[in-house]
């Protein structure tokens, strides 16, 4: 996780059942060190959830800040690669495990303003499928969950900390709660160990992908 205060709160709630680390997934060496130094009771990772990700900018490609684009690439792509590369060898050695990569419908459908964010999530989609193919013969499951509108801090982060942005963006919509999305992930994990949910795409009923843009000359 990124925020020590939230991790401390969880540790107080769950006690010795939880081990926490403040970690920047963009830092390859820090990720490797974190995984290598886990306490014995937590060293054998059976489930990996690559959930770190963000969207910045949201304007036209040529007008957005290049630093924002590189931050998305570092977090959404390199972060997934760093953590998976550190954790997967142990899963292969034990011949069991489940990797969940959190993608987005933005990586499947075109959305203006999403050229970089959507591309990073397209990477997550194909990385999941290719990794799944490479692991054929191992008892390791690999799944990508691709949500639409979920009630997280996604919009607030994109809006540079504007806490009112979420309400404006989702005004009049009933969106998926974080708990509901967690239930979907747990469902995929709870399937029999020989059953792999490759791709799970989910949206609230108030959202779909039917956005066709037409330009007309005047």
Q: Which ranges hold each PLM region?
A:
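Active-site loop immediately N-terminal to the catalytic Tyr-X3-Lys motif
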Residues: 62, 111-115, 173
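Substrate-binding pocket helix/loop in short-chain dehydrogenase/reductase
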Residues: 59-61, 65-73
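Alpha-helical segment proximal to the catalytic Tyr-Lys
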Residues: 89, 133-134
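Residue(s) in the substrate-gating loop at a strand-loop-helix junction
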Residues: 104
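C-terminal helical subdomain
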Residues: 144-148, 163-211
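Active-site helix of classical SDR
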Residues: 84, 120
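The beta1-alpha1 cofactor-binding region of Rossmann-like NAD(H)/NADP(H)-dependent oxidoreductases
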Residues: 5, 22-34, 66
